[in-house]
């Protein structure tokens, strides 16, 4: 084999290996990608059904119902509400009226079943996505009240 052909074969093999590696990385990234939605976006049908995503907002006052390890509550962004159920131990900082981000799936009836629940960790912190969703919902609420 001539040196030029050998070099071309090595370059072609390297490019093929690089392409396969890039495909595998992107495929793994896509399967682990979890999007964030506010209750308003979920209510509008923007969230996927039967696919994992995160929902964030505030735990609505008076909606937490406990039954052993199963907890049902409502997440709100002050404009819309989504019922959530979770089986497991909640974080110590989980409280009504406080910020929460839950990861799970939405069923056909609009009920969110969480596999993980995260609570804010001090009085000044709220996840950026949840803060932005609450601010957007408040703006929409203000605009509607002005009309």
UniProtKB/Swiss-Prot annotation:
Membrane topology classification: Single-pass type II membrane protein
Compartmental location: Cell inner membrane
Membrane topology, Periplasmic segments: 29-147
This protein's UniProt keywords: Cell inner membrane, Cell membrane, Cytochrome c-type biogenesis, Heme, Iron, Membrane, Metal-binding, Signal-anchor, Transmembrane, Transmembrane helix
Annotated GO MF terms: heme binding; metal ion binding
Sites where the protein binds heme: 121, 125
Record keyword 4Fe-4S present: no
GO cellular component annotations of the record: plasma membrane
Cytoplasmic-side segments: 1-7
Family label: Belongs to the CcmE/CycJ family.
HAMAP family found in the cross-reference section: CcmE
Function of the protein: Heme chaperone required for the biogenesis of c-type cytochromes. Transiently binds heme delivered by CcmC and transfers the heme to apo-cytochromes in a process facilitated by CcmF and CcmH.
Family annotation (PANTHER family): CYTOCHROME C-TYPE BIOGENESIS PROTEIN CCME HOMOLOG, MITOCHONDRIAL
Protein name per UniProt: Cytochrome c-type biogenesis protein CcmE
Gene, per the UniProt record: ccmE
